[in-house]
C-alpha cells in the first residue's frame, strides 16, 4: 500500500437521495456496506474498507463513521507534501500589519489559504527561497458571501453588509504605497447587488490605474449570475487579467458549488471576457481530489482551451471544516506534474499545478508579468 493512502468510507445505510448528493460513485450491493473504489495511475491509492467499522488491523481510539458525505478516514494524516510551516518572515509580518491597519480583507486569510506565508513573504515560505515578489489577494465587497459553496471557508449570509463606498479608493492608495508591480483583486459573491459588484470592482481597478499606471491588475471574479453586461463593465475597466474559476468538472458542479453557479455559465463568462478586449489574458482554476476522473479533468481543460483561456491552475482540495465536503483523494505531486505537462500540450500559455497551488498562487511571478506585458506590447502597434 502507498505510504500515504486515502481511506474512503460511506455512512451506512445509504439512501438514494443521499447517494445523489454524494461524491461517491461505487457499485453498491444491497445488504453490504463494503465499497470498492478504483485507484488511479500515478495517484494515491484508495483502499477497500467497511463503512461501519475501523479498517482491519487498525485499532483507532474513538473511531466513528464519517458524516453523510464520502470522504477520507478522519483519523488519517495529511501526506507530507501538504504540510506547511507556520507563516513567518519580515515581509509577512509587515504586510499583515498594514492590511489590518487599513481594514482590508484578503482571501488569503478568509479562505484559510495554506500558502499565506509563502506568498506574503515573497516565496520565502515552504516553497523555498522564492523570488522576493510578495503577493496578496485583496478581497473587495466585504468578507461575507451570498453563496454557500461546499468547499469554501468564507462566511455566508443572504443579506451581507452594504459595500463600503470608500473601499475602492482606500484599496488603491494602499496598494500603490506598497510599491508592488502586480496585484490580485477578488471578491465574495454579491447576488444581493444589481450588478453583482461589478461596478465596485471596476472603480477599484480605475483608481489603481490612475494612481499607478504601470501596475498590472488581475481580477478574480464571481460569475455575476451570468450577467454579461456586468462582465463587460469590469473587463473594460483597465484590468490586465480576467480570472474566473470553473472550480471542478461538469458532473460535480451541483455537489461542489452553490446551485446558482454552473459549468456552462462559467465558460460563458470567461469567453465573453476574452472577447471584450483585445489582448485580454484569461485565467481559471480546477480543484482536484473531489471525486473527479482523469477523463473529466481532461475534458474540463479542453473546454477551457476551446474558449482560449490562457492560464490554468490546478490544486488539491483541502477540507476547511467538518461542515465542508470531505477529501476523496490526495493527488500526488507526480500526478500534478502530469497535469501541468498535459495542460501545456493543450496550448495553455502558463500552467501552475501542485498540491498547494491555488487560483492566486504566486500570481504576480515574473513569468505571468512578462506574459501580460508581452501581450500588451504585441497589441500596441495596432492601436497607433
From Swiss-Prot:
Residues binding [4Fe-4S] cluster 2: 145, 149, 152
One GO process term, biological-process aspect: lipoate biosynthetic process
GO MF entry, a single one: lipoate synthase activity
Localization, UniProt: Plastid, Chloroplast
Start and end residues of each Radical SAM core domain: 128-349
First-tier enzyme category under EC: transferase
Reaction(s) catalysed by this chain's protein: [[Fe-S] cluster scaffold protein carrying a second [4Fe-4S](2+) cluster] + N(6)-octanoyl-L-lysyl-[protein] + 2 oxidized [2Fe-2S]-[ferredoxin] + 2 S-adenosyl-L-methionine + 4 H(+) = [[Fe-S] cluster scaffold protein] + N(6)-[(R)-dihydrolipoyl]-L-lysyl-[protein] + 4 Fe(3+) + 2 hydrogen sulfide + 2 5'-deoxyadenosine + 2 L-methionine + 2 reduced [2Fe-2S]-[ferredoxin]
A single Gene Ontology CC term: chloroplast
Cofactor mode of binding and number, as noted: Binds 2 [4Fe-4S] clusters per subunit. One cluster is coordinated with 3 cysteines and an exchangeable S-adenosyl-L-methionine.
Presence of keyword Plastid: yes
Range annotated as the organelle transit peptide: 1-48
Keywords: 4Fe-4S, Chloroplast, Iron, Iron-sulfur, Metal-binding, Plastid, S-adenosyl-L-methionine, Transferase, Transit peptide
InterPro entries hit by this protein: Aldolase_TIM, Elp3/MiaA/NifB-like_rSAM, LIAS_N, Lipoyl_synth, Lipoyl_synth_chlpt, rSAM
Protein name: Lipoyl synthase 2, chloroplastic
Lineage: Eukaryota, Viridiplantae, Streptophyta, Embryophyta, Tracheophyta
